[in-house]
Design a protein with these regions (language model features):
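Gly/Pro-biased beta-strand-loop elements
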Residues: 50-60, 84-90, 162, 167-168
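Aromatic- and glycine-rich peptidoglycan recognition patches
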Residues: 20-42, 46, 104-106, 126-128, ...
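Bacterial N-terminal signal peptides that target proteins for export
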Residues: 1-8
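Extracytoplasmic/secreted envelope proteins and their assembly/folding machinery
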Residues: 47-51, 55, 75-79, 110, ...
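Catalytic cysteine-centered active-site loop
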Residues: 37-38, 60-112
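C-terminal motif of bacterial Sec signal peptides marking the signal peptidase cleavage site
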Residues: 14-18
């Protein structure tokens, strides 16, 4: 009888122990560093992996066709971040990402992780630049002059060149 009770007790412990929910563990020091580097407050509801990965790319120089921390272009940056954070492969060209990987999203409906597309003024229906929307009208992208940087959709240049938002 004692063996039977012991068996029941062990079974209950194993069963009840496996029912608990697991909350993801975050390295809060890493989040704090990302918050400082990005100059943004990162909340509990935010996608922490997106902000940490974005901070890791900040300052990487621009290189046409690049997709590494030695040099990256705009679509290479979005591809690399999406692969790491969302485990999703994106096309390697801004216009292909817009047409093949995304459904259109209005500027006022952008959510964290959406792609933001811009034209160069010559071909107003062709995406020539892409970034990833973070929050508060800020997005990360690879600038030809400044490398990987954070910009605001409210800046005159980006307002003028806005094409669309996209949700992969």
């Amino acid at each position: 009888m004692k063996q039977f009770r012991w068996l029941i007790l062990c079974t209950l412990i194993i069963f009840l122990g496996s029912c608990r929910t697991i909350t993801p563990q975050y390295d809060y020091q890493e989040l704090a560093r990302a918050s400082v580097r990005l100059d943004m407050d990162i909340d509990r509801k935010d996608n922490h992996a997106l902000y940490v990965e974005s901070a890791n790319w900040l300052g990487v120089p621009y290189r046409s066709g690049g997709i590494s921390k030695h040099g990256v272009d705009c679509s290479g940056l979005t591809s690399a971040i999406y692969k790491k954070v969302y485990r999703k492969n994106l096309e390697r060209n801004a216009n292909d990402q817009r047409k093949k990987d995304c459904r259109k999203v209005k500027k006022g409906k952008l959510k964290e992780g959406d792609l933001v597309f811009f034209h160069n003024g010559k071909k107003k229906k062709t995406a020539t630049h892409v970034g990833i929307y973070l929050k508060d009208d800020k997005f990360i992208h690879a600038s030809t002059r400044r490398g990987v940087t954070i910009s605001t959709l409210d800046e005159a240049y980006w307002k003028k060149c806005w094409l669309s938002g996209g949700r992969p």
